[in-house]
């Protein structure tokens, strides 16, 4: 903890500097600089507050120990002992919380995301389940105060989704949804099953951070643009003109389709933004093999036996196989109440990080 304490002392000094800068008229007048400073302050605020509470508790314990050592007032001594017992528990909890807050940050945690959901093994039932997952994430996003827009989708005749790509924007979206990557398995009786037998199907979910203002120039000659009619989930955005846009970056084979905006021009602009992000990610991965491996690791193959989570409808049960978490709340989870699952995953992976840091210390 000594090394962490030294870092915290430096962090507190920097935090105080930032607070002074935020009151500086010159900084306030520079909008870009001011936004950078306020973001840095917000990122540091919680850990600095906990560190200050930690130090205050330590000082209070030291004061109580003096009362105990003096021993002249038995009643005060007893009160000091009780206070110190409570403060020691609080300090222990603060230490754990501070360690987690000081873990290396995932640079993508603050980013918005593109989420791709695909029906995998199981035919029509897999496509219906893909639609259920789409609605689950839309409701969860709504609960978080995030915004969701459909980037591209392909529906099936039974009302499910062969694939759906959505953009979710808001506060720390990637940090919450990055653990949703993988194959999701459903066990239930399909509506088409007359014998009432439980079937197993899967859908895959891929979560990719959306890079902002990517510094990459794409040669227009290397991009094929196709336009077609929107065919989304229905509603007022669907029109009879060829407003949907599909862009293919020929050197990498990366394809982006966009149909959620109201005009072809808007779809072109958004598709180009996403394409730049994907191509940037590709080149950051250095080559096609690494890029493909990253995406495969994210979603798996969609095979029934390869799953991160199982949704068992007859038993109203959801099991996350990575952490051994089972909740008999499937109805609530499918209605977007994912916090309990996501919080458990976050704690699990943070604990693993702490263990790895301890081993390498």
UniProtKB/Swiss-Prot annotation:
Gene Ontology CC, one term: cytoplasm
**Location of the protein in the cell:** Cytoplasm
Q: How is it modified after translation?
A: Methylated by PrmC. Methylation increases the termination efficiency of RF1.
Give GO MF terms, alphabetically. translation release factor activity, codon specific
Which SUPFAM superfamilies did the record assign?
Release factor
List the coiled-coil residues: none
Q: Does the keyword Protein biosynthesis apply?
A: yes
Q: Does the keyword Protein biosynthesis apply?
A: yes
Q: Give the similarity note.
A: Belongs to the prokaryotic/mitochondrial release factor family.
HAMAP family, per database record: Rel_fac_1 (MF_00093)
State the name under which the record lists this protein: Peptide chain release factor 1
